[in-house]
């Protein structure tokens, strides 16, 4: 039997992960990016951009459930939701499961990403692009949040790492724009990397977000193919009570929602805000 090809992630110089490639579905390498989607027997379809895993069919539900249900159930009565990025459609899929949400706006810089993912990652969106509450806006995320006349109850930044095209979604200009179009008591969340290996990223986001929000923190989830430990999500709001809701309140909202999840549950929600000591110490050592 011929040996299978291997794809190696290149995010870190001294260590990393690899995947056996059963079948390459798409590969485009240009001067600007290297995008590949391949099939792997253990993780299903895998999408990687510039040598970094973006999503896999097997474990994407963890990331998307935690990015969606934590802020929406903490808010409790969100009507208008903004997704920045999220072209694969899985974040949209999870938001559409909240029946009390009235409008979902997704801002994607490249229309081609949406059509591409609908073709190659259909399980991610699971038909959610056809939800009547959904509106797609083709625009730069920073420009949109600083120019739109709309306001939102929850903003989810489904961004790539802060290198290349994703870098602008970690800037003060973006955070200030999000504060501008967030309703009073609203919640902003964003992926912030694996804090054990990308701690400076979390510290930088915390410092910048603290200029615009009175309550800034993080919550976490374990996502196998985001190599290196626990994934960190930024959390920012002006209502500090939302990060400390009782488990009874979260449980009641969860039951009322009718959600059936594979990772998220009310106990996980509460526990996710418990941060490791090394991250607490790093945040505490920053100048006020």
Curated annotation (Swiss-Prot):
MF terms (GO), sorted A to Z: spermidine synthase activity
Top-level enzyme category: transferase
Species lineage: Bacteria, Pseudomonadati, Pseudomonadota, Gammaproteobacteria, Enterobacterales
Protein name as annotated: Polyamine aminopropyltransferase
Gene Ontology, cellular component aspect: cytosol
Places the protein is found: Cytoplasm
Main localization (coarse): cytoplasm
Active site per UniProt: 158
Residues noted as binding spermidine in the record, renumbered to the chain: 64, 88, 158-161
Record EC number: 2.5.1.16
């Amino acid at each position: 039997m011929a040996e299978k090809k291997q794809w190696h992630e290149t995010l870190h110089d001294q260590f990393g992960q690899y995947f056996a490639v059963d079948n390459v579905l798409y590969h485009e390498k240009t001067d600007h990016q290297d995008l590949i989607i391949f099939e792997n027997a253990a993780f299903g379809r895998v999408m990687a951009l510039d040598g970094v895993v973006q999503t896999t069919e097997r474990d994407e539900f963890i990331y998307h459930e935690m990015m969606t249900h934590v802020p929406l159930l903490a808010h409790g009565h969100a009507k208008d939701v903004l997704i920045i990025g999220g072209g694969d459609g899985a974040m949209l899929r999870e938001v559409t499961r909240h029946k009390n949400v009235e409008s979902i706006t997704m801002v994607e810089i490249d229309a081609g990403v949406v059509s591409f993912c609908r073709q190659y990652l259909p399980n991610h969106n699971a038909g959610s692009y056809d939800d009547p509450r959904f509106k797609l806006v083709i625009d730069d995320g920073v420009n949109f949040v600083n120019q739109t006349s709309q306001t939102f109850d929850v903003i989810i930044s489904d961004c790539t790492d802060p290198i290349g095209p994703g870098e602008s979604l970690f800037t003060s200009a973006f955070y200030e724009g999000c504060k501008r179009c967030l309703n009073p008591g609203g919640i902003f969340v964003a992926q912030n990397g694996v804090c054990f290996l990308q701690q400076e990223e979390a510290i930088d986001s915390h410092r910048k977000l603290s200029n615009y929000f009175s309550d800034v923190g993080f919550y976490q989830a374990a996502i196998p193919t985001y190599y290196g430990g626990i994934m960190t999500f930024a959390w920012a709001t002006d209502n500090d009570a939302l990060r400390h809701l009782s488990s009874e309140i979260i449980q009641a909202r969860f039951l009322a929602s009718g959600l059936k999840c594979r990772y998220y549950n009310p106990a996980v929600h509460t526990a996710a805000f418990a941060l490791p000591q090394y991250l607490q110490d790093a945040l505490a050592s920053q100048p006020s």
